[in-house]
Amino acid sequence: MFTVNNVRASSEEDLYAHLMAQLDRMLHFGTTVAEVKSGYGLDLESEVKMLRVIRRAELSHEITVVANYLPAHSVVPGHTAASMAQDIVTRQIPAIKALKDQGVINPLLIDVFCEKGIFEVEETRAILEAGRSIGLRPNLHIEELKHLGSGVMAAEQQALGVSHLEHLDTEGIAALAQAGTVGIALPSTQYLLHLPPAPVRQMIDSGMPVALASDYNPNAPCLSLPLIMHLGCVNLGLTMAEALVACTLNAAASLGKSETYGSIEVGKAGDLVLVKAPSWEHLIYQMGDAPIDVVVKAGRVAATPRH
């Protein structure tokens, strides 16, 4: 609860300044579209505060910000998982809808930390269904610490993306591949928590698109997608080409943004990263010192990290 208590005690201005500083750093690492989650308020007032901050960043920062509402990140003192899920479904989500309709906040996604002993499958399903009823699309944590069989449920809920996945099984992979859900591996978290690798090769071989993400949070404070791609190759067994697609087109698809972002095509946003190196592979190969020369956002130079 350390981070939750600090978020609850922080002013909106402090949170906004912190978020904008992190987005600035992400831009210099080549990120032009970022999912930003709530999830460290865990009561309605504090979650709304976080979502207001994310909305302000969406309107003011050069990075395209996609807000993910994460009301069920942990069970807070005074609640059981069941009572917290009930409160989220009956009280919090209707309030989120009202504020979204007013334009005060703009979450597009909904997330639950679906894990044994925290929010299990039925509680997660109820929260996702309530979120979907107000137009939020599921993009959630599953199968990180223990196998729970949540992959099939996520597929049934038409999740855009599912993340962590270290204990995802064959049945879950098949269901998610059939649903077109993107599997989001988080190699920095896997590395720092000494978790088994997500079964990305089996996912790819089964036709399930794989994305990579930083999972930037207090337990995995990494903002560098070039480093994430490096870890994806070394620790998860991706090829460099697979890692690049995972951090671009498939990542955009996990946010419902692949029609506009994620590849260089006529009609898409002009977001580019120019690398000063003999070949693009040096973006991944040069561990911790990616040779990013220019970051272009919507056809305009947004950052020049090496100048």
Predicted regions and their residues:
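Metal-coordinating catalytic core of metallo-dependent amide/deamination hydrolases
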Residues: 3-18, 24, 32-148
